[in-house]
């Protein structure tokens, strides 16, 4: 990884499911997050003012986990395509190399569409580490993306390229450490079923307008880092590239 990628949240293959403390069924009340939808169910034309571009339809990444990690991925459901092949979705937000992605339409537009979809209700909170209610964002994501675009989605698929992490507190985005003394609080969730969003703003993060883009999603023990700066082509503060 690049020298700037100091945060060890970037290490691949780190995801924790603790069945005793965080049962995988904990997503049952969080917008029907696990599993797939019929790829043709509920699809409708998306044209005219206020509609999202249908070119986003195939912003997908098809990767299958290694056998040694298969037990960690038993909540990822395979969606059957018309050709009978099964897709594994572990990322829906990334600009990837051609061999790693299937992208129809503009990558920037599609990526930013999803990123805004997930974070728009949060972006006005730019001071400290906030605990933000995710119900609106998650339900909106499920409705617009799953039902209208017909994408296979499970809670946590917006995480970065399968780089799973077992951090349950907000981290300092440039050093991978807890917030310094005197900084904003980083409370743990008490009720995992509430599906909260821990959002850390880091003044040291110059990309994306000074926004630290790490997050922790608590449901079924899923934790993740949204970004992969190693192939971020446009660190220009507008959420394009690598997000």
Swiss-Prot record:
Instruction: State its location(s).
Output: Secreted; Nematocyst; Target cell membrane
Single GO molecular function = toxin activity
What processing steps or modifications follow its translation? Contains disulfide bonds.
Q: Which GO terms describe its biological process?
A: killing of cells of another organism; monoatomic ion transport
Task: Tell me the organism.
Answer: Cyanea capillata (Lion's mane jellyfish)
Write out the biased-composition intervals (Basic and acidic residues): 1-25
Role:
Has potent hemolytic activity. Is lethal to crayfish. Causes cutaneous inflammation in humans. May act as a pore-forming toxin, disrupting normal transmembrane ion concentration gradients in susceptible cells.
- UniProt record similarity statement: Belongs to the jellyfish toxin family.
Q: In which tissues is it expressed?
A: Nematocytes.
Q: Which keywords, in A-to-Z order, does the entry hold?
A: Cytolysis, Disulfide bond, Hemolysis, Ion transport, Membrane, Nematocyst, Secreted, Target cell membrane, Target membrane, Toxin, Transmembrane, Transport
Tell me the segments the record calls region Disordered: 1-48
Q: Which GO terms describe its cellular component?
A: extracellular region; membrane; nematocyst; other organism cell membrane
Major place of residence: secreted
State the name under which the record lists this protein.
Toxin CcTX-1
């Amino acid at each position: 990884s690049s020298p700037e990628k100091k945060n060890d949240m970037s290490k691949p293959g780190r995801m924790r499911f603790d069945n005793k403390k965080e049962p995988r069924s904990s997503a049952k009340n969080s917008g029907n997050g696990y599993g797939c939808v019929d790829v043709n169910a509920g699809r409708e034309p998306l044209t005219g003012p206020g509609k999202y571009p249908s070119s986003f339809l195939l912003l997908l990444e098809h990767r299958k986990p290694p056998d040694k990690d298969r037990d960690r991925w038993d909540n990822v459901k395979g969606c059957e395509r018309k050709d009978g092949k099964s897709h594994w979705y572990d990322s829906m937000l990334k600009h990837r190399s051609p061999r790693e992605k299937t992208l129809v339409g503009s990558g920037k537009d599609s990526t930013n569409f999803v990123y805004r979809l997930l974070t728009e209700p949060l972006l006005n909170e730019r001071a400290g580490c906030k605990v933000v209610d995710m119900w609106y964002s998650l339900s909106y994501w499920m409705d617009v993306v799953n039902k209208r675009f017909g994408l296979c989605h499970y809670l946590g698929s917006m995480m970065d390229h399968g780089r799973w992490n077992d951090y349950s507190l907000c981290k300092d985005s440039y050093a991978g450490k807890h917030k310094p003394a005197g900084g904003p609080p980083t409370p743990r969730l008490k009720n995992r079923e509430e599906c909260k969003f821990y959002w850390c703003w880091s003044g040291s993060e110059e990309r994306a307008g000074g926004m630290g883009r790490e997050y922790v999603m608590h449901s079924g023990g899923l934790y993740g880092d949204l970004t992969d700066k190693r192939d971020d082509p446009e660190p220009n503060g507008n959420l394009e590239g690598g997000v």
